[in-house]
Amino acid sequence: MSDPRPARAVVVGIDGSRAATHAALWAVDEAVNRDIPLRLVYVIDPSQLSAAGEGGGQSAARAALHDASRKVEATGQPVKIETEVLCGRPLTKLMQESRSAAMLCVGSVGLDHVRGRRGSVAATLAGSALCPVAVIHPSPAEPATTSQVSAVVAEVDNGVVLRHAFEEARLRGVPLRAVAVHAAETPDDVEQGSRLAHVHLSRRLAHWTRLYPEVRVDRAIAGGSACRHLAANAKPGQLFVADSHSAHELCGAYQPGCAVLTVRSANL
């Protein structure tokens, strides 16, 4: 008989890195809002064990989980913390966690940094996991004691993305910047495209502003690629909400101090 799936939780990949600690702090509000546990998971990769062997790997895992738990507890938030050490490839194990997780949170670096593939696990999870994935990229100046969101940013074409964006803005009490994109090659195209984009933006937002009247919405029109616009206008504290198909492009382009939340169309 197979093992039962773990209870639903907000899962954070912990590896001892500063980015992972920020991911745990960022995830606290998500767990508290859902009234579910915050599950901190450390994955020991057998192929990366040193001469100290499994014992050394277990010690490092316990130390990293203890440090992350202590920092979460220091927030004073009423969150239930669970910890677990798993053995295997980080990407494989975290993908398995995504089957039952309400959300998966990881740092933008770490997990696979020893192989020189900066952020590869995070970007792959963001594009392929079975639940929403938050990738946290802390600013070097931001202390590992808190992780704040100052604004949510989303492109309006995807209704699932908009729903998650409004929910995040409501949860964190911050404004939502809604972006509509148009493609234009001539001045006439720009004028016409901008006018149509404004109409499209108003139509797309009408339903959600009725459902979330407490969320302040700032509107923006952009030409060309939504990902390029979001990256070019990134500011510390912003949370970009996007479809998982944009994960690799966004995870490689956003600025320190920002975060990306990717959702699949099935993540309703």
UniProtKB/Swiss-Prot annotation:
One of its GO terms (cellular component) is peptidoglycan-based cell wall. ATP binds at G13, G107, S108, V109, G110, L111, D112, H113, R117, S120, V121. Induction: A member of the dormancy regulon. Induced in response to reduced oxygen tension (hypoxia), low levels of nitric oxide (NO) and carbon monoxide (CO). It is hoped that this regulon will give insight into the latent, or dormant phase of infection. Member of the Rv3134c-devR-devS operon. Disulfide bonds: none annotated. Keywords: ATP-binding, Nucleotide-binding. It holds the Pfam family Usp. Disruption phenotype: A strain lacking this gene does not induce most genes of the dormancy regulon, due to polar effects on the downstream devR (dosR) gene. Restoration of induction only occurs when both this gene and devR (dosR) are transformed into the deleted strain. GO terms for molecular function: ATP binding. It comes from the Bacteria. The keyword Nucleotide-binding applies. One of its GO terms (biological process) is response to hypoxia. Belongs to the universal stress protein A family. This is Universal stress protein Rv3134c.
